[in-house]
Amino acid sequence: MSPRSKTLSKQMKAKSRSAIISAALELFAKKGFSATTADEIAKKAKVSKGLIFSHFLTKENILLAILDDEIDRFLPKFDQNDEARDPKEKLVSFINGWLRLLEKEPLLVLLSLRLNLDESWRKILRKKGKQYVEIYLKRMRALLVQAGSKKPDLDCYLIGVLFDGVAANYVAAPKLFPLNDIKNYLVELLFSYWQN
């Protein structure tokens, strides 16, 4: 096989893998993992069922690939070079990053919510995302201490629960949910809570 043929073959393989991942993400998010068939994924991705299984041995492997490809987008990143900024600015930046993820990747957020409702997948999701959650908790805790939180560990979980609630309501009715108003109110609410 010529170098050009190898390059084209790699590109085609990457393109078909990407199509499978995109189709599966949408179907798993909208229908649920168990309710989605490999035939539906093949049809949506416009590939053969055999091609799906040449990339992934099982439907579970497709989901694991989605998690591997997308896990770092579940948690917005903190800017590590923002030591000079005050805690409120950092929190606003974090909330904005998380809300951008929610707006740009609602299917990914919906899939995460669905998986968290399924005990077996919740364990897998937690295991896969463990390092990211630990980074999130460490950085969020430090930010909360800076911001004046008296119970930063509990506040980390409280913020997580608030984010889950916002995410669930937004993906259920994105056109009706006042996301920008919630963002502004959430920052003010958290800071007034810590100041008391």
Enumerate the predicted regions with their spans.
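Helix-turn-helix
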Residues: 19, 23, 27-61, 65
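Hydrophobic alpha-helical connector segments
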Residues: 65, 79-104, 146, 156-159
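Short, basic, alpha-helical segments at the C-terminal edge of helix-turn-helix-like DNA-binding modules
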Residues: 68-74
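Amphipathic alpha-helical packing segments from all-alpha helical-bundle domains
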Residues: 75, 104, 121-147, 154-157, ...
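Short alpha-helical scaffolding segments that buttress acidic/His motifs in well-ordered protein cores
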Residues: 98, 112-116, 159, 163
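Amphipathic alpha-helical segments used for helix-helix packing
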Residues: 102-123
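Hydrophobic alpha-helical segments that form the core
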Residues: 151-172, 181-191
